[in-house]
Amino acid sequence: MTRPTLEVPVDSLDSAVLAAPFATRLELCDDLPSEGWTPKTSLIERVRAAVDTHLVAMIRPRFADSPLTLTLESFIANKRVMDASTQEIKSAAAAGANSVAIGLLQADGHVDMNACGELAELARSLKLEVAFLRTFDLLADRARGMRDISALGMKRVVTAGVLGWDAAISTLEQRIAVLLSDAMNAAGAASAKALASGKLNASTTIKSAHANAPEQPHIPLARHAVEIVPGGGVRASNAARFMSVSSHLHASCRRDGVFNLDEMRRLHAVMNSAQ
């Protein structure tokens, strides 16, 4: 299995400092209870001064009239959103972030390739990795979405393996099945890119990197597939099941709206035991 990684979303310096010893990455955002917005530059600077952990800045501009609903319409690009996102990416880089997470969509339910491509190009010019937000779960076609974010060169994507934002609408087993399909789509998309660029022999095949996942003998080897990062209700109690799909997890470890250090420790222990 690939070395496990844990991404923890935080919206304060205190929670960042508590999570840092256990996290591979900290996703910095503002107002986590509303699923997060672009963090203030001052938060990135203070966390950067306090910890050495890889920092991801969520890029989700907030305006006085921003809708709080977590629907497709809330993530559609326009000039105001693009102007703000551009400045926020520049500010995040200057403040010490290592990555940004973006996820702008079109009204037809597909990835906004132009908007995301422009922001990703800017981020990479500033030496930032680029990831895709959980807006992936709002897409009309997950297979096409995976091809799209692969074409955009996304490093990883956070997804609950559901359609929509409410992870509770599906059983754990249903989510695992969707995530497995996402992982195979990611491998297929990466392989297609490699074949197109002449970097992969069409006869090369792969096996799943995870012992509990089904073998897929006809999928070409994909060394640079988008990393599937299960998120949405990930806990120590179910982490092992999610890790049957991916060794990368996204968990806030919050109880009653507050970061819970005991849950963080339990989750970290489960992930370490899976190595």
Task: Give the label of every model feature segment.
Residues 10-31, 95-96:
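Catalytic domains of carbohydrate-active enzymes, especially glycoside hydrolases
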Residues 14-18, 65-91, 137-151, 219-220, ...:
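Catalytic cores of alpha/beta
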Residues 42-113:
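Glycine/small-residue-rich loop that forms an oxyanion/phosphate-binding "nest" at active or ligand-binding sites
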Residues 32-51, 106-124, 139-144, 163-183, ...:
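Active-site-adjacent beta->alpha loops and helix N-cap segments on the catalytic face
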Residues 22-27, 51-54, 96-99, 125-127, ...:
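Glycine-enriched alpha-helix->loop->beta-strand junction motifs that scaffold or abut catalytic
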Residues 4-8, 26-28, 55-59, 100-102, ...:
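Hydrophobic faces of well-ordered beta-strands that scaffold small-molecule active sites
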Residues 62-63, 67, 180-275:
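C-terminal alpha-helical cap/extension of soluble enzyme domains
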Residues 27-34, 95-107, 154-166, 245-264:
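Glycine-rich phosphate-binding active-site loops on the catalytic face of alpha/beta enzymes
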